[in-house]
Curated annotation (Swiss-Prot):
Span list, region Disordered: 1-57, 328-368
Residues modified as Phosphoserine: 235, 242, 344
Protein localization: Chromosome, Centromere, Kinetochore
A GO term from the CC aspect: kinetochore
F-box domain ranges (all copies): 61-109
GO molecular function annotations of the record: identical protein binding
Identification of the protein by name: F-box only protein 28
GO biological process, one term: protein polyubiquitination
Length: 368
């Protein structure tokens, strides 16, 4: 390296060595005219190819920001969301990349929480009294508190995120939610909910208060007019970093619609599950109605049979009563004469009592 530098300095005119060059060489270098200025290329001619640069002479735009968006996101994915939120101060391009990653991070942590809650609920018993004494009761309490915190954050930030006026600013909140969810998944006997969620409640409350007091008044002024991304996208695309900015703006424009589609899909799944439960209940009710109708038909058949039996018994009683009357009348007609005149009233009385007893028995059967 030293020899090469000495040769380069000797070619340029002696460098710092006093005995490295002759006076004639120095004079010749002083008599050389300055190089002519570069002339612009003619319309029909081709520009000469640029000379290759040494590795230590790379252009200044060969930085992290000049990389493709996918590469930047892949690099930033190894960092925490708190660090990503702080990198928004670097430049506009980095700000757009970090905004997109923060918005996606909030949606991802919501999906991760839904997955954890679904797994815990699948292992819990259905009865509320049994859930309280279950080993996963604290897990369910912590996840329910996280769900409440996520809904508050959603109501505070996502209105303006969907309008593309800002991003989900507090990246530290996302990191803390991930920490709580991983703690719940990896611990069999977690601490109480207020102990685990103390840090999350503090930083999320501070973030929401600051957002409502300091940032929302500024964003409300932009709500009636066009948003920032719409004004940025009004400029024509040019190759280079500005084209990547336009691509990022398109992605950020599409995020609200994707989020709405995701919410609609979740609502459709919930409604489908409710419809399935209702159909199952309707089928059970139909089965019960059919069983009751069958029982009613059996009761009607039995009632008809009993009515027929009662009719037959009534007919038999009427016939027996008629025969008894005939026998009594014939007996009364045959008992004539003086000797039998005293006994005839007694026989008539007995016959009348027998007829009355038959009539009473008939009435009782008719009542039954």
């Amino acid at each position: 390296m030293a020899a090469a530098s000495e040769e380069r300095m000797a070619e340029e005119g002696g460098g710092g060595h006093g005995d490295g060059g002759s006076p004639s060489a120095i004079a010749s270098t002083q008599r050389l005219p300055p190089p002519p200025p570069p002339q612009p290329p003619q319309p029909g001619s081709q520009a000469p190819p640029a000379p290759a640069l040494a590795p230590d002479q790379l252009p200044q735009n060969n930085t992290l920001v000049a990389l493709p968006i996918v590469a930047i996101e892949n690099i930033l994915s190894f960092m925490s969301y708190d660090e990503i939120s702080q990198l928004r101060l670097v430049c506009k391009r980095m700000d757009l990349v970090c905004q997109r990653m923060l918005n996606q991070g909030f949606l991802k942590v919501e999906r991760y929480h839904n997955l954890c809650q679904k797994q815990v609920k699948a292992q819990l018993p259905r009865r509320e009294s049994e859930r309280r004494n279950h080993s996963l009761a604290r897990h369910a309490d912590i996840l329910a508190a996280v769900e409440t915190r996520l809904s508050l954050l959603n109501m505070t930030f996502m209105k303006y995120v969907d309008s593309n006026l800002c991003c989900f600013i507090p990246g530290k909140v996302i990191d803390e939610i991930y920490r709580v969810l991983r703690y719940v998944n990896s611990t069999r006997a977690p601490q109480r909910a207020h102990e685990v969620l103390q840090e999350l409640r503090d930083i999320s409350s501070m973030a929401m208060e600051y957002f409502d007091e300091k940032i929302v008044p500024i964003l409300k002024r932009k709500l009636p007019g066009s948003d920032v991304s719409g004004r940025l996208m009004g400029s024509p695309p040019v190759p280079g970093p500005s084209a990547a900015l336009t691509t990022m703006q398109l992605f950020s424009k599409q995020n609200p619609s994707r989020q709405e589609v995701t919410k609609l899909q979740q609502q459709v799944k919930t409604n489908g599950a409710g419809v399935t439960v209702l159909r199952r209940e309707i089928s059970e009710l139909r089965t019960k109605v059919q069983e009751q109708q069958k029982q009613l038909q059996d009761q009607d058949q039995k009632l008809l049979e009993q009515t027929q039996i009662i009719g037959e018994q009534n007919a038999r009683l009427a016939e027996l009563e008629r025969k008894l009357r005939e026998v009594m009348e014939s007996a009364v007609g045959n008992s004539s004469g003086s000797g039998q005149s005293e006994e005839s009233p007694r026989k008539r009385k007995k016959a009348a009592e027998a007829i009355d007893s038959l009539r009473k028995s008939k009435r009782l059967r008719n009542r039954k």
